[in-house]
């Protein structure tokens, strides 16, 4: 493999044995592609905004004399960029402008004669835009729209599993689900009649539906039944024989062949052998006794030819009398319905008998009554209602997916078709459910991923936009029908408010629009790849059963079987598997390698769950010989959702990678294959809660996916094009682009601005640091700067800690963790949290609030950190209770005494009219002010601080743009100088030229002269562009802010809090091994090895066996080897050994392992590169052990040998307190530990006096309400058991809800009297009132 200059800085040793056929696709593509389809103009009009417009327009007036047509749309440019939107608290969106055409038709002339056409561009609200990282900025906060897994439109057949009826009989049902419109259900009842329901309302016999579709009784019978033909003879009947129909029946008469010999005697059961005999003898007719026909049903009406009287009506039961009537009337032939108990049920026949309607109108009226109970039906209303239910494109749409699923399920060859239902569709569904009831077909599995599809951002936004358009449509139609249209323009007809409101509602408050989890890069990526079955049109937690939540065979390679939340949402919220993607229909697909005649090719095909069932698919870990053939004869594979063994020749596809089945979070767990699934689930979920540490450190033992994840998450800065690093500082990187990657006529400079110390959604700190230096070569895709939780472009969620598995004085009882003081001293788990505190000055009824440093009754010391405007300085260190922003609020005028009036008249004392409502630091917080933002309403005078901040921003913008301009100008000038050198100018001449004159030289060579002129033009454009950009920036900074009504000013203060690790903080490894820190132990007391090196953390070995997450033990051994190799390299460098020796050792490390795919050609590295690599490996060599394809025990032992460590992985340890050796050896190594965002500082809380609940008068609960501790029922029992009567009494009275008692208590304490008199608890009064409300009077007597 070829490594770029920056990749050579540190190479992760990979133990993967399988060749890489396919790289993990871009992780955020599910979000970005979906939204791109929504906003991109689609000429076919099948998706996105275009589809929404085409589905609603043209809008015709009621009279048909005018219509509003849609022509095209365009999205404008957003006013503010993403960062500005976040600071100002506005939505990152672009204005949508639509070109509409109003056509007026001439009433007097022939139909369709156009009288007037008006075209105009109309503003239709703002559409939120997606940022490059797949998020939306809504009101200043980053949000993610989670994709939804919902039941695909189409037709589904199911049964009730015998739960509906007491007999336990299985009742089948069919349901046609459209994308939008009414649901149509068919279901059997316990008596085997077929019923229909529309939108889950009252059920009607299914034949009513057929009658409404203009089928007569005769046609219905012909559709659903075969006939049995009889010829009527004098005493007998002759039946046309279809031998197959007799199978399984008991003969009620002798069955004879054509010659008259008896084949089956009366009373015998007819078997397949008998049927073969009948077929052999070519018997086509069979004489049956007259009684045989009794109880059969007529297949048609029989009419007396003379009188016209109906002798036997269709579907009526035939009796001997009926037969006699038919003979008398001279009717010689009779047809009955072919029905048998086994596989030709009388379902439709029975249904017809309970159907009270006889014609179409009656059926329509019946449906109307069911849909609109209480309304008088008219013929037109009933027809219109039925037509609109399933046959109107405006009200009903199966969608392309629905039609495809519908046709495939009913074996209709074409995948395309109408979006509405046809008569034939409904009949086909009824035939199919009867087919299933007869036992010829199976019901569907609704949890199969072929029956559930993904609805992503673009599709949901399109649906919401359509909802808004439909609201507008009604208003437009009314306006077109009213008023004089000659005066109106399209602008006057359209009101953009409903559209904006629908879109805003979706992005702001939909259940699937979620506040982005921004703890670390992994949590961001996982949140964007989340698939939820909840939300509008989905399931609800309460109703979702076990089956829906369970892992289904079709999840393989599509949804991760590991990563899902614990708790009520388990299995309803899933994560996309690493390689999965959605197809054009929204079904999940996963890639497979094609296998042709037993040879595995590198051709990759994506298969959906439906397609996968048809093929035989082998796993990725099968043995492959040198020719790319399968080495074994019998191969473990999957076919039709079952695991089985098949011959190598039968295999059609093979997995692309062993990591294919799991999500990115799960594939970050090394040695995942050795962990129990429950613990792996916790490990995957807890990595998302890791807080970025002060100095990120890459994991020594990783899985090789760390880099992909860090790059795709968007937190690191990646080079867009190759070149050389020209300039680096903490906030900007400049890359000079390679000549061959330049676009014509550009300066050839890429400038990357870095994000510095900004706040994330979870209050963690986002900060980017450059990881390249000037002069370094860069190729496209190289990491230039690290973000939070990344280290040289690798994801780094925690720290590598030296761990010992041993008990230590009970401090690691029940998963507690003992850590060394050194960990805290070295700031290994110190994290920075940034809090945003806001102070809002409003306009009140009594006057405006004012932000000022002049606050009544506050001492000088409290104001020492404020400037003259009353706002805290940047850099000030503040603690709980300090004033950040001084604010005074007008108080109501109180009635003054004459003396006060006199004093006020003399001294002009007015300060008592305002009260102090300043913004203070919350009690438990202590930190440093890192930024202040002041927003002032338009028209309100800006205070001095606001002006200063504004000037600072303008100066910063001028400096930034100026430097950018200078860099780009230098790029142009250097190219011009190169031209002049080529034209014969000497270096000295060029050096003597002033900068501005370089571009106005005259050259003899015409082409070069033209190039020089082009460069001069470019320079002018740059200058003009700079002025324009600066003007826009200046206008943005100085313009007033758009604040909420009644708000004059908002001051936002950003406070950085440094949190070191302390007892009570939660920590975890990557294998679900979590615990709380119990004690920070002095370094000298920690166990140490023979070299005197103490361990950092002591974990309880009892946490491993019962949890079955052995991966952590292997990680510790591998970590020890990796660190040991790093220590060896360090020793070599410190002893200044020969570089060849260092190179040889590093080469030995990278070549270790059996059949390892990775090849690192250390020999091709220059000495400088080897030295730099060695320096970066001093902390330990990073290792990749991919899930299901990782390092084996043998390789871990080889690594330990290379590191010069015992292959047992265990060391002698000594007790730090006594110096004695522990009685047996201890497993010591390096584990990657995470600090989770469950910090004791956020949870610890104490209450003195605070708020009480209004009804019970008891203290509230929880930190947010400054509440107390609940002393519950069991705690009361505990005190009762100890006989602590007085403690119990005060707990239940004065410390809780005895209102008078607690006031008296306070007074007593103030007076120094420590007595207490408990009274009646308020909750007892509540109980009395409750009992009285039930009508039972209780009165209290004085004792």
From Swiss-Prot:
Can you name one GO molecular function term for this protein?
Answer: DNA binding
Query: Keyword Transcription on this protein?
Result: yes
A Pfam family found in this protein is RNA_pol_Rpb2_3
Q: What is its EC number?
A: 2.7.7.6
Q: Does the keyword Oxidoreductase apply?
A: no
- Supply one GO CC term from the record: DNA-directed RNA polymerase complex
Keywords, sorted A to Z:
DNA-directed RNA polymerase, Nucleotidyltransferase, Transcription, Transferase
Cysteines engaged in disulfide bonds, as pairs: none
Origin: domain of life:
Bacteria
Q: Which reaction does it catalyse?
A: RNA(n) + a ribonucleoside 5'-triphosphate = RNA(n+1) + diphosphate
Q: Which residues form a coiled coil?
A: none
User: InterPro entries attached here?
Assistant: DNA-dir_RNA_pol_bsu_external_1 (IPR019462), DNA-dir_RNA_pol_su2 (IPR015712), DNA-dir_RNAP_su2_dom (IPR007120), DNA-dir_RNAP_su2_hyb_sf (IPR037033), RNA_pol_bsu_bac (IPR010243), RNA_pol_bsu_CS (IPR007121), RNA_pol_bsu_protrusion (IPR007644), RNA_pol_Rpb2_2 (IPR007642)
- A GO BP annotation: DNA-templated transcription
Specify the enzyme's EC class, one word.
transferase
Record text on subunit structure and interactions: The RNAP catalytic core consists of 2 alpha, 1 beta, 1 beta' and 1 omega subunit. When a sigma factor is associated with the core the holoenzyme is formed, which can initiate transcription.
Write out the similarity annotation. Answer: Belongs to the RNA polymerase beta chain family.
UniProt cross-references to HAMAP family, sorted A to Z: RNApol_bact_RpoB
Role played: DNA-dependent RNA polymerase catalyzes the transcription of DNA into RNA using the four ribonucleoside triphosphates as substrates.
Q: What is this protein called?
A: DNA-directed RNA polymerase subunit beta
